[in-house]
Amino acid sequence: MSETTLLDIQSDYIFKRVFGVEKNKKLLISLINSILKCNPTVTDLEIRNTEISKIVKNNLTIYLDIKAEINPQEFVDIEIQVRNTGEIMERAVQYLAEILTLNCRKLTEKEKEAGQRQTYKYPKVIGIWIMGENVTDRKDAVNEACVAFPPTERDKYQIITDKLRIFFVELQKFHPKHIDRKNMLDVWMAFLKNPLNDDIQDVPEVKEALDTLKEISADKDEREIYYLRQHTEFGYISEKNVAVAQALEKGKKLEREKAKAEKVESAKKMLSKGLSIEDISDFTGLSLEEVKKL
């Protein structure tokens, strides 16, 4: 299969079909461990949302993430996006808060069912955002954000809680001269940028991921879903750009109307003080006809 026939691994649909399926669970574990730097070390996980084909066909506007439980009371949510569509930081926090709240309720309900004393159990939630475009000003390709007190003159930097952690992986910032095949973070970022990168083809995990990608790319139904998904994503971005342009134009129109109203008000004051129509036109920029109508 030639390179041109491979579907884009950075598509959220294709990414999930490669990494978010049970048969490739060990690939997902490898990817997560490489990003988390084995803190914690994931040895097994349960993928929580594997069903996607029906969802994608019925609702093409959804975001296809991978949700997994990596340890008891510890969850990971992985998102991949080709483009920076804006407000990524806010959405990342929102998604993690929703996962934390949902699983907090589930843990509390389990205690209730077991007849135990009900207490709020807060799970740990880790968000991983793999971005095709840059979203931070940080120099490194992988950065972790957490909830913390910033340093002051009297206090040091202090992490408030380890319950919420967010990792941003910015593929545009990854351009090493040499890929260390023993460093799986390098390997996976290279794969996500170019699955056919010659430097990583002898890595067993890459071979397995690439075989899956080739199978998906050769499947007629999978390609149909992929192109439908791409069409919808591009349509969404275009609609968003149009909406932004319309909002900007509306803002400019309001500014023009406000400026015109201020000129009219100034012209009326000048008329009341006996200034000539010609002078008022010169001072305000209003035409002679506009001044005469006041």
Task: Tell where the protein language model's regions lie, with residue ranges.
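Low-complexity, glycine/alanine/valine/leucine- and proline-rich hydrophobic stretches
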Residues: E153-F167, N183-P195
